[in-house]
Swiss-Prot record:
Protein name (Swiss-Prot/TrEMBL): (S)-N-methylcanadine 1-hydroxylase CYP82Y1
Regions crossing the membrane: 18-38
Gene that encodes it: CYP82Y1
Keyword set, alphabetical order: Alkaloid metabolism, Heme, Iron, Membrane, Metal-binding, Monooxygenase, Oxidoreductase, Transmembrane, Transmembrane helix
Chief location of this protein within or outside the cell: membrane
Molecular-function GO terms, alphabetical: heme binding; iron ion binding; monooxygenase activity; oxidoreductase activity, acting on paired donors, with incorporation or reduction of molecular oxygen
Keyword rRNA-binding: no
CDD domains tied to this protein: CYP82
Protein source organism: Papaver somniferum (Opium poppy)
Reactions performed catalytically: (S)-cis-N-methylcanadine + reduced [NADPH--hemoprotein reductase] + O2 = (S)-1-hydroxy-N-methylcanadine + oxidized [NADPH--hemoprotein reductase] + H2O + H(+)
Cofactors (names): heme
Length: 556
């Protein structure tokens, strides 16, 4: 800037009379060192605010020209978090990779995570990198989940956490959760009732694909709260729900598909050639149509209420998240140029992210319990002792959020399951400015991968880290460790400003469902052991579906 000012003044100098020009030139020659000094000082201050050191990030070996480390992650059978874990064993808890033009910082210790998400770094690491999937299926920068950190995102976050997912609002929607969980358990009992023998008094174990049932349950619970979908709805409504569910399932599959353009934008033609771009565009259109129809139905419902001059829902109508969002939008509190897109993006984010995360945690938790029958027996003893035999006599025991604090072993089981098998093994962010992490300089635009899976198995932090041991969370050492982002050694829901806003909701559903399963069913693995292999992909899915032998429990 100082150079440009001097250059501009020289042009002015040649336009002035000689005497005046001489005075101006003398003045500039005197002033220019001062200008240059302050410009350099300002740059230095900016540099000092963001980067105390200039030590570059250590880079893993094996990078190729142009594509960088891409080939290390091209084996479709390898799990990225495991590959990165092996690299951390070699390079330490902080190192970098290159993918095309993108530099990626990889951290795998709680100390490094704390550096990234405390102080000024927390704000700098509050962006998520965009991707082909986000651009084509999730409204790009207007998506709640992927919008850049700034006023727009903060307003959406405020709406989500304070007006949709606050404790007060969750209490208001409590009857919807319980209703859908009840409906799902009734379906499960119906499956088992078909296997009665001996004059309809003796149950024979029924083989049930539990990961499918978990998906059914979580979609119904979240769909009911977000958009009013009911699992026992009439045929027309059920058809809409099925379209919704199919679109969400397609999103999950496409999100797990590698897009070349996310790494090397100039090679975007490969994604078009393979058909990935077209599939994502079509899926995005389906999602927008389904969510748009739901929003329009809710708008018509509000107009009907307005025309009737009642100002309130009838006894047959329920308020859900979309209703709340539309009310906020009417008060002009939804930010951005397209408030309706904001409403749709919030609904879509909750339906897609919430359903997958909760289903996966349930699936891994039950898998672990079936492979450790001694721990399942301890959980059963706690549940039976707390609720008593009386509530097992019918198939609709009252399990409420208020019961959770008393079920300490159930809480420990779910924590330990999320420690070993987090729903998302990698947490991804991007820095908006230069910063320092671990004594290294991190340039602006660097992507961040937090290897949650590796960090939560750190032997420095966890004794016998590969062992499923819920008792560790009952000890004085780990008893106070929480999963809501404040204890950096255990962050299954993330941490920092972009921590999952639905963590409390997910935990309530997890405790409710696991407790009822243990209360109402005897559960066994059909072939002795459950296969615990994980499938590569965006979410931490199992390779083999979870088939379980279920027998309803009865009084002795």
């Amino acid at each position: 800037m100082a150079y440009l000012m001097i250059k501009k003044s020289i042009y002015l100098f040649f336009d002035q009379p000689t005497a005046v020009g001489t005075l101006i030139l003398a003045f500039l020659l005197t002033l220019s060192p001062v200008i240059i000094y302050y410009e350099q000082k300002k740059r230095g201050l900016r540099r000092n605010r963001t980067a105390i050191t200039t030590t570059p990030l250590p880079e893993a070996s094996g990078a190729w020209p142009v594509i960088g480390h891409l080939l290390l992650f091209m084996n479709e059978n390898d799990l990225n978090h495991v590959t990165l874990g092996h690299m951390a064993d070699k390079y330490g808890p902080i190192f970098s990779l290159r993918f095309g033009r993108h530099r990626t910082l990889v951290v795998s210790s709680w100390e490094m995570v704390k550096e990234c998400f405390t102080g000024t770094n927390d704000k700098l690491f509050s962006n998520r990198p965009s991707s082909l999937a986000v651009k084509l299926m999730f409204y790009d920068t207007e998506s709640y989940g992927f919008a850049p950190y700034g006023k727009y995102w903060r307003e959406l976050r405020k709406i989500s956490t304070h007006k949709l997912l606050s404790n007060q609002q969750l209490e208001k929607f409590k009857h919807l959760r319980i209703s859908e969980v009840d409906n799902s358990f009734k379906k499960l009992h119906e499956l088992c009732s078909n296997n009665k023998q001996g004059g309809d008094t003796t149950y024979v174990a029924s083989l049930v694909r539990m990961d499918d049932w978990f998906a059914y349950l979580t979609f119904n619970v979240i769909g009911r709260i977000v958009s009013g979908f009911q699992s026992n709805a009439v045929a027309g409504a059920t058809n809409s729900q099925e379209k919704y569910k199919l679109a969400i399932d397609e999103v999950s599959n496409l999100m797990a598909t590698f897009a070349v353009s996310d790494v090397v934008p100039r090679l975007g033609w490969i994604d078009r050639l393979t058909g990935l771009t077209g599939k994502m565009k079509n899926c995005g259109k389906k999602l927008d149509a389904v969510v748009g129809d739901a929003v329009e139905d809710h708008r018509q419902k509000k107009l009907k209420i307005s025309r009737n001059n009642t100002g309130a829902l009838t006894e047959h109508e329920e308020e859900d998240f979309i209703d709340v969002c539309l009310s906020i939008m009417e008060q002009s509190q939804i930010p951005g140029n397209h408030p309706e897109i904001s409403v749709k993006s919030i609904a879509l984010d909750m339906l897609s992210g919430g359903s997958d995360t909760t289903k996966l945690i349930m699936t891994w938790t039950l898998s672990l319990l079936l492979n450790h029958p001694d721990i399942l027996d301890k959980a059963k003893e706690e549940v039976d002792t707390y609720f008593g035999k009386k509530k097992i006599s019918d198939n609709t025991p009252v399990v409420d959020a208020a019961d959770v604090p008393n079920l300490v072993y159930i809480q420990a089981i779910i924590k330990e399951s999320m420690r070993l098998y987090p729903a998302s093994t990698l947490m991804e962010r991007m820095t908006s400015d230069d910063c320092d992490v671990g004594g290294f300089h991190v340039p602006a635009g660097t992507r961040l991968w937090v290897n949650v899976w590796k960090m939560q198995r750190d032997p420095r932090v966890w004794k016998d880290p590969l062992v499923f041991l819920p008792e560790r969370f009952l000890s004085n050492d780990k008893g106070m460790v929480d999963v809501k982002g404040q204890n950096y050694e255990l962050i299954p829901f993330g941490t920092g400003r972009r921590i999952c806003p639905g963590a409390s909701f997910a935990l309530e559903v997890l405790h409710l469902v696991l407790t009822r399963l243990i209360l109402e069913f005897e559960m066994k693995a059909p072939e002795g052991k459950i296969d615990m292999r994980a499938r590569p992909g965006f979410f931490h899915n199992k390779v083999v579906p979870l088939d379980v032998q279920l027998t309803p429990r009865t009084l002795d």
